[in-house]
């Protein structure tokens, strides 16, 4: 009888734990006796993944916190490498967390261990020279999006498009009426979802612009309601402080978390660029993407970022599908103009395109990723 498959796996944050758990579940269906160990969060551990270290060891945010924890993170990496080189797994899977995982993968691959990196870093957008290290470090990159694979193909780097787990999770036709009932909002009003970002700097920069736009929109559409999901209590307090100063009388429904629900309930979405734009596309909502950075950050981004568009719907479509208002173009007046177009025009062609793009990346990513790992294992 062959030995059970041994799989090393590392996730560094909550999103990685969710992603890794989906993959582990599919691999367990193929290899019931498989043994998993590495750096694991609660969802992975609930499936039986042995945690050599807790995921919190890697879950750090911001440069100050990273620098403070760096000695510990480097110690964890040394001990992890020592363990896997002394007890080689049949395959190692690094889930996201590229700053940690790519270095681990490189050393393990040089030691003769097969390696997979799940979730391509945004190497197609900036710091493109990283592709050479990724190519040396991995036997396979599992990519969420088709244009990512196309980028890897240019460098003859092994990559497989597996689809996006978010596209698997979201139904092709979300139930707006049900979500409005759940949120307790008026089903007969028009609603705009306002998402000013998840980080402190984003919320600080984008909220004043979005609030000014909302004030103008209220004059134009007196029946318009606003839903504002904030990722946590801190961002909620930050947003409320800005609102108290700039728009104290503006009536808004504030939610903690529930970004997806807010977008499903809305008719149109106004958001800061990021993953939220992909989510808005998947829930089939016309959107206006706005983004503003500090002047130096923008100057730097112009030189580093190599893509024609900033939002994922436009990158997926390969054309300007939804309006992007970046830097000097991101004004309250321009936001009002673009949002108003969606309220005043028929959006069915746009929604149809969103549905086509949803189907393009809805491939049962967990299963596809497990299949790719199984092919590399060869058993």
Curated annotation (Swiss-Prot):
It comes from the Bacteria. Its EC number is 2.4.1.182. One of its GO terms (biological process) is lipid A biosynthetic process. One of its GO terms (cellular component) is membrane. Pathway: Bacterial outer membrane biogenesis; LPS lipid A biosynthesis. Keywords: Glycosyltransferase, Lipid A biosynthesis, Lipid biosynthesis, Lipid metabolism, Transferase. It catalyses: a lipid X + a UDP-2-N,3-O-bis[(3R)-3-hydroxyacyl]-alpha-D-glucosamine = a lipid A disaccharide + UDP + H(+). PANTHER family: LIPID-A-DISACCHARIDE SYNTHASE, LIPID-A-DISACCHARIDE SYNTHASE, MITOCHONDRIAL-RELATED. Belongs to the LpxB family. This is Lipid-A-disaccharide synthase. It comes from Aeromonas hydrophila subsp. hydrophila (strain ATCC 7966 / DSM 30187 / BCRC 13018 / CCUG 14551 / JCM 1027 / KCTC 2358 / NCIMB 9240 / NCTC 8049). The gene is lpxB.
């Amino acid at each position: 009888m062959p030995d059970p498959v041994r799989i090393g796996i590392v996730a560094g944050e909550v999103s990685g734990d969710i992603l890794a758990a989906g993959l582990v579940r599919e691999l367990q269906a193929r290899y019931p006796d498989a043994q998993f160990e590495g750096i694991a969060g609660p969802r992975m551990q609930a499936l039986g993944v042995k945690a050599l270290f807790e995921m919190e060891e890697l879950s750090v945010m911001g440069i100050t916190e990273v620098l403070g924890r760096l000695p510990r993170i480097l110690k964890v990496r040394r001990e992890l490498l020592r363990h896997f080189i002394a007890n080689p797994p049949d395959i190692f899977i690094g889930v996201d967390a590229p700053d940690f995982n790519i270095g681990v993968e490189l050393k393990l691959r040089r030691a003769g261990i097969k390696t997979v990196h799940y979730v391509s870093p945004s190497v197609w957008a900036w710091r493109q020279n990283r592709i050479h290290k990724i190519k040396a470090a991995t036997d396979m990159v599992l990519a969420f999006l088709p244009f990512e694979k196309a980028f890897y193909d240019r460098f003859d780097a092994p990559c497989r498009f597996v689809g996006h787990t978010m596209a698997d999770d979201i139904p092709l036709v979300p139930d707006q009426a049900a979500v409005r009932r759940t949120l307790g909002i008026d089903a007969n009003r028009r609603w705009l979802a306002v998402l000013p970002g998840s980080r402190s700097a984003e919320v600080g920069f984008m909220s004043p612009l979005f609030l000014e736009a909302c004030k103008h929109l209220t004059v134009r559409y007196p029946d318009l309601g606003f839903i504002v999901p904030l990722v946590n209590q801190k961002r909620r307090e930050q947003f409320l402080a800005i609102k108290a100063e700039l728009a104290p009388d503006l009536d808004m429904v504030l939610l903690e978390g529930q970004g997806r629900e807010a977008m499903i309930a809305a008719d149109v979405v106004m958001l800061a660029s990021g993953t939220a734009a992909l989510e808005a596309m998947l829930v089939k909502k016309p959107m206006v993407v706005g983004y503003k950075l500090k002047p130096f950050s923008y100057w730097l981004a112009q030189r580093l970022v190599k893509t024609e568009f900033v939002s994922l719907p436009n990158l997926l479509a390969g054309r300007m599908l939804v309006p992007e208002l970046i830097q000097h173009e991101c004004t309250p007046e321009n936001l009002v103009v673009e949002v108003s177009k969606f309220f005043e025009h028929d959006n069915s062609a746009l929604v149809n395109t969103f549905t086509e793009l949803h189907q393009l990346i809805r491939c049962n990513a967990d299963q596809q990723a497990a299949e790719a790992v199984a092919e590399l294992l060869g058993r």
